[in-house]
A protein has these predicted regions:
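A residue-level marker of the well-folded mature domains of exported/periplasmic proteins
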Residues: 1-267
């Protein structure tokens, strides 16, 4: 925030890239992926691919409690999962804070913070692994079987998947991810991770350059929403995201030139 304020004082137009600068009115524009849509896509995938029946064990994990995007990702996921939690399709089994709020569709920032504080992975592979191990150790067989797991990104997804895949009482798991990391694409091909949300940084970069050019030309950049950064509503341009599964890895990532087929085995 301090750097943005210094730039603003010099008459510079400040464009936040991917991460929103919070707590200052020195931000003019924001270019980002639709973080809410990322979480909603993760949650919807779990709903669409959950085993039949009700009372399906649901394990919730989130990013860092210090990261504004982690809140938006989780909020997006909650927006689609909450009705299915409230009607008994899913049963939250690793967060009593989330259970206490399971009948509430719209959570306040404080309520989100309470849940995320309990299920945070800090965006760290080892933290996610330890938390998953602790959750499975604390739970009995009735909270295992065929389960669904909301993992916030690819690194944490792989860590959690590694833990769940070695528990003899977990017969299957559906798990989300985000970022289309090479290691997770291989996991998806191998059936160890269910999906990832692909955020094409080439498109994000192009959108940010277009915004900067508009500013330099004295024009008002194209925006499609606003994000509140705790000091103002910042005009923003959101870049679309793509759900990637084993079925569309080739078309989404190889044919588009993002990765090469030789980067993976089993394609």
């Amino acid at each position: 925030a301090a750097a943005a304020e210094t730039a603003k004082a010099e008459g510079v137009t400040v464009i936040a890239y991917d991460r929103l600068i919070t707590g200052t009115d020195a931000v003019d524009y924001y270019v980002t992926f639709d973080s809410f849509a990322v979480g909603a896509a993760q949650g919807q995938f779990l709903i669409d691919n959950a085993p039949a029946g009700s009372g399906i064990p649901l394990y919730l994990y989130a990013g860092a409690a210090t990261d504004n995007n982690a809140f938006i990702f989780f909020q997006g996921a909650w927006s689609v999962l909450q009705p299915k939690i409230a009607d008994g399709t899913f049963k939250i089994v690793n967060s009593d804070e989330a259970v206490a709020l399971q009948d509430k569709a719209d959570l306040t920032r404080e309520e989100l913070s309470t849940i995320i504080g309990q299920i945070t992975t800090d965006w760290d592979f080892n933290v996610a692994k330890s938390k998953a191990e602790a959750n499975l150790t604390a739970n009995g067989a009735d909270a295992k079987g065929d389960v669904c797991v909301l993992a916030p990104n690819d690194g944490t997804s792989r860590a959690i998947a590694d833990v769940f895949s070695t528990d003899k009482d977990v017969t299957s798991y559906v798990i989300s991810g985000q970022d289309a990391e090479k290691a997770s694409i291989q996991y998806i091909i191998d059936g160890k991770q269910s999906m990832t949300v692909f955020k094409d940084t080439r498109t994000l970069a192009a959108d940010s350059v277009a915004m900067a050019v508009s500013v330099l030309n004295g024009e008002t950049p194209a925006t499609d929403t606003t994000y509140n950064n705790e000091a103002k509503d910042v005009p923003a341009k959101q870049t679309d995201v793509v759900v990637v599964t084993k079925d569309n890895v080739k078309s989404a990532l190889i044919d588009s030139g993002y990765y090469e087929a030789g980067d993976f085995t089993g394609l």
